[in-house]
């Protein structure tokens, strides 16, 4: 089990720094000023994770997603001054986190200093840590990085470098009921089991939008049920296709795939009532929810038009010389078009 902790962003630097307290100053924080994790809290969480056999992976995103750093120091991370400061921060971070890995980001940024990433990887390794980096991001050859983390459909595992698959696993893009089906069905990186090149998967909860209560992240994004769905694949392997294949559609009731999901749902609801009792577990049974979905009728931009299904429900419709079918769908969340495609 893994907990990936993204500690720094454009909006704020959320990990306390004793050597550079200005990083946590409210004047350098543009969202939820004054809120950050102390070094003592970070150490306590490391101990908690160890007791529960959870690997904690802290992330200090560099050189992108670093506007908070720039506000505090008036230096870009890739500048000579920025690199000196960052190494001092890495000393503090590596001392605080008694864990084997450190994630250094490297995504969504223009590289202006070709020495920045190799030098930072070497520096973190000199502290006894293995290094993880986003892909797409800096391009590595085998031996130049310890693991990559795929964050986009463009992300590709490289032979000789273990990869973590998070390409389509963004909870903030999910419907609570629809996408759990895709997570459960999905092969990790379209592989039935792990290998030296495919290390596993991580479920991403990016709270890009401002919220008034942190617990709403858990509720609105269906964290716990989706976490169990992806754990089913991470622990057991299998799956029927990749996330963007069958997608969020529950298979027909008479198929083995449907029966397997129904069994998983039953087990998940047991955990809701027992393991997660008292926690916001946003899921109810959906394998008994059935819909009839009619092909789309063109309204030509006229929102007041009335169509045959509004007068009478049928299995097929003939309208203006065209035939419109009806198909059954099962589940509490139905997409007409998904964020990842049709």
Regions found by a protein language model. Give the residues of each.
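Substrate-binding cleft of carbohydrate-active enzyme catalytic domains
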Residues: 1-127, 131
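Active-site beta-loop-alpha junctions enriched in small/polar residues
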Residues: 8-10, 61-65, 107-109, 136-138, ...
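Short low-complexity, flexible loop/linker segments enriched in glycine and/or proline
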Residues: 17-22, 71-78, 141-150, 177-182
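A glycine-rich phosphate-binding loop feature that marks nucleotide/adenosyl-phosphate handling sites
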Residues: 65-66, 103-107, 137-142, 244-248
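Short glycine/threonine-rich loop-to-helix capping motif typified by GTGT followed
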Residues: 111-119, 144-153
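Short catalytic/ligand-gating loop segments at beta-alpha or beta-beta junctions
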Residues: 133-138, 181-183
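Flexible, acidic glycine-rich loops studded with aromatic residues
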Residues: 144-146, 152-280
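Disordered, acidic Ser/Thr/Pro-rich linker "stalks" and the adjacent N-terminal cap
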Residues: 278-341
């Amino acid at each position: 089990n893994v907990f990936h902790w993204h500690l720094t962003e454009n909006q704020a630097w959320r990990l306390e720094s004793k050597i550079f307290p200005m990083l946590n100053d409210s004047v350098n924080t543009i969202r939820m000023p004054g809120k950050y994790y102390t070094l003592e809290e970070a150490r306590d969480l490391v101990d908690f994770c160890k007791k529960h056999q959870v690997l904690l992976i802290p992330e200090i995103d560099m050189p992108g997603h670093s506007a908070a750093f720039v506000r505090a120091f008036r230096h870009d991370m890739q500048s000579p001054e920025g690199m000196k400061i960052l190494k001092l921060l890495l000393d503090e971070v590596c001392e605080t986190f008694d864990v084997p890995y450190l994630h250094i980001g490297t995504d969504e940024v223009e590289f202006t200093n070709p020495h920045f990433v190799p030098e930072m990887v070497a520096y973190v390794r000199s502290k006894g840590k293995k290094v993880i980096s986003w892909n797409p991001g800096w391009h590595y050859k085998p031996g130049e990085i310890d693991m990559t983390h795929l964050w986009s459909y463009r992300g590709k595992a490289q032979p000789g470098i273990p990869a973590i698959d998070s390409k389509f696993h963004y909870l903030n893009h999910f419907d609570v009921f629809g996408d759990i089906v895709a997570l459960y069905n999905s092969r990790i990186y379209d592989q039935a089991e792990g290998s030296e090149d495919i290390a596993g998967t991580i479920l991403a909860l990016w709270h890009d939008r401002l919220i008034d209560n942190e617990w709403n992240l858990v509720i609105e994004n269906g964290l716990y049920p989706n976490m169990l769905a992806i754990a089913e694949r991470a622990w057991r392997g299998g799956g029927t296709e990749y996330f963007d294949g069958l997608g969020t559609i529950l298979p027909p009731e008479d198929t083995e795939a449907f029966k397997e999901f129904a069994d998983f749902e039953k087990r998940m609801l047991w955990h809701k009532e027992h393991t997660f009792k008292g926690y916001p577990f946003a899921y109810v049974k959906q394998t008994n929810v059935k819909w009839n979905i009619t092909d789309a009728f063109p309204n030509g931009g006229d929102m007041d038009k009335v169509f045959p299904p509004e007068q009478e429900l049928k299995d097929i419709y003939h309208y203006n010389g065209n035939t419109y079918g009806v198909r059954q769908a099962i589940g509490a969340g139905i997409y007409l078009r998904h964020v990842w495609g049709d």
